[in-house]
């Protein structure tokens, strides 16, 4: 009887460990996917220019800039229209600049890739126009 109980408990423990590991692996894969659509690389080394264009793009999209730190490379803003907070970080990587946007509505992260695609499309257009001295 005791042997049967020990075998059952052992099997349950092994099953619980396997489930936990699977959840951890799925969570890491999900994080990588999220990071992928939240991040874009731009072929420039001018961090200040990119940050200025991010501020302009966020304002064009209805965000009020709450904080911008050029030394650290972060910009935060809030949209009263749709109650959304967005923080964008900028960091150099080789001969390019990596930009990562993170948006949330209340306490819930925005996970729709299209929202980030819209932001990066507007930012790309702004950088293009600035580079070609249209603005």
Label for each model-derived stretch:
Residues 1-4:
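Positively charged n-region of N-terminal signal peptides that target proteins for export
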Residues 7:
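Phosphate/nucleotide-binding beta-alpha loop and adjacent structural elements of enzyme active sites
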Residues 13-16:
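C-terminal motif of bacterial Sec signal peptides marking the signal peptidase cleavage site
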Residues 18-135:
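Ser/Thr-rich, low-complexity intrinsically disordered terminal regions
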């Amino acid at each position: 009887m005791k042997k049967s109980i020990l075998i059952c408990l052992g099997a349950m423990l092994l099953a619980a460990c396997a489930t936990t590991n699977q959840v951890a692996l799925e969570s890491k894969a999900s994080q990588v996917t999220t990071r992928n659509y939240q991040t874009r690389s731009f072929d420039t080394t001018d961090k200040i220019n990119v940050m200025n264009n991010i501020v302009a793009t966020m304002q064009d999209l209805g965000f009020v800039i709450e904080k911008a730190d050029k030394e650290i490379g972060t910009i935060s803003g809030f949209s009263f229209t749709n109650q959304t907070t967005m923080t964008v970080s900028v960091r150099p990587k080789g001969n390019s600049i990596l930009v990562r946007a993170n948006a949330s509505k209340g306490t819930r992260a925005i996970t729709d890739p299209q929202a980030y695609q819209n932001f990066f499309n507007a930012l790309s257009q702004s950088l293009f126009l600035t580079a070609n001295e249209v603005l």
